[in-house]
Every structure is written in C-alpha cells, then in structure tokens.
Amino acid sequence: MKLILENFRQYLDADEDTLTGLSFEEMSRALGSSMGGAKLALTDSPLQDRTYEQGSTMKPNGLWYAKGNSWMEFVRTELVEMSENAKYVYAIGFDKSKILRIKSGRQAERVTYMFKNHKLSQRANVSIVDWDRITKIGKAGVEFIPYDRGYFSADYTMVWYSGIDVPSGCIWDTSILTTKQIIAELKEDGWEVYR
C-alpha cells in the first residue's frame, strides 16, 4: 500500500487540485474513486450542442455516458482502440424528464413492444427498436441505470438490450445537458484529472 501511495503522489502537480501525467488506466481509477456516482462521458472532441439522427438500430446514436468509471474500465479492457482516441471526460447533468429510463429487462421488453420496428425486426429475426419514434414522444435520450445484466430473453429477440455493456445512457439531443464539466483531459504528457 505504501508503494501505491508513493507512486500516486508522483503524479500530483504543484496545484493540488490536479493530477497530471496519468495513463488512461490511472485516470480511470482516479475518477472511479472520486466520481463513482457521477454520470461521465468519454469523448474524442469537445462537447457541443447537437442532435444525433436516430433510426432503427440495435443501439441509439448519441453521447453515451455511464455511472462512474464503468464505461472507461470497459473501454480499457475491451475496446483499447477507443481509449487511444479519447481526449476528454465530462461530468454531465441533464433534465431527467427528457430521458426514457429503462431499469430492468422487463421494462426493456415493454419499450420494445411499444417502439419496435416490426418490418426490420421480422427480417432480422430479433427485436429492433425504432429510436426515432422515441424522439417523437419528447425524449432526448435513454438510460439503463441500473442495468439488468442478468436479463436474457429465451427467444433471443432482445439482443439489443443484452448488448448494453455497462450501466449507461445515451443522449441524442445534447441541448438537454444542464452540466458539462471537463473533469479529465488528455495532454501531451498524459491525462490530467481536475478535482
């Protein structure tokens, strides 16, 4: 433990509110310990207000976020190339009334029933959600927190829900963001974490 603390201290800048020169893994762990309950978005460019076009796909298009560092840890171990392209981590807040919240596999089934693209689903032999129809009821995103990882549909029709990697959400109209604070940024000498 003493060695870990000594190694961690070497990254402290003169400014005690900033950690500098961190690897992606170190940055992720630092945020995990200090921002565990926050909604964090990992991006390759600065956040700007925009609307992502939706269609009938397995997952919606948009700004994905996760609770704490769960997405960053998934990226670090499963999607290494994405971690190499990342440049910013934002803590975000938003108008929750604009988000469709799916807290269980059963709720995902109901959403699928209500917003299924029947033509595409029949051709693909799996349920495909028409995310554009969800935008038409005034929703600007969807959230899977908590995520029912153990849910599995016996007939494999809910593949889209099983493909959610971590407790997360997707915002396709970022104008609902009430907070977008950069909390980590990739610099020349590594990641800088602002506390």
Region annotations inferred by a language model:
Residues 1-16:
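Short acidic, low-complexity intrinsically disordered linear motifs used
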Residues 17-52, 79-195:
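Active-site and NAD+-binding cores of ADP-ribose-processing enzymes
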Residues 47-85:
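Extended catalytic/binding region for NAD+/ADP-ribose chemistry, centered on the ART fold
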Residues 6, 10, 73-77, 113, ...:
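Charged/polar, solvent-exposed surface patches and flexible loops
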